[in-house]
Amino acid sequence: MSGGEQWMLIGEYELRTDHKGRIAIPVRFRETFRDGLVVARGFDKCLLVYATAEWVRLAERLASMPLTNINSRRITRLTFSGAFDLGLDGQGRVVLPPALRQYAGISDEVVLIGAYSHLQIWSREFWNEEKQFMIEHAAEISEAVEM
C-alpha cells in the first residue's frame, strides 16, 4: 500500500490448486496484489507472497548487506533464486511455479495464511503440523521472542 494507508494481511484460508498449479487469492487480498506480486521460498517449507512494492523494500534491505559477509551472500542467493515475479489473472488466481510447489510439498490442498505484511502458502499437511506445534508451545514461543 502507499502513502499513510495502514493495512495488514490476516486470517487462514483453505484452498485447492487446480490442474495448472493455480490458487485463487481470497477476494479481500486481491487489491493488495493488483500491481503484481512476488512468490518466494520461505524458511519453513512454505511459500511467501509479497506485493511487489513490499518485496522491493525487502530486496533493498538484502542488497544493502555487506558482500564481504558469506551469510549475507548466502541469504541473498537463497532469497532471490527462489523468487518469481508474478501477477493475478482475471479471476484472481496466481500460478505457483512447479519448483516452489515441490519445495513446499504442495499438491492440491493448501492453506493460505496472513502474516501481516505478506501471505504464506503451506501444504495442508505441513501447516497442520506447524499449527499444532505452535498451539502446544505458545507460551514458550512467546517468551523466546519476548512478546
Language model: regions and residue ranges:
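Flexible "stalk/tail and boundary" regions
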Residues: 1-15, 19, 27-86, 90, ...
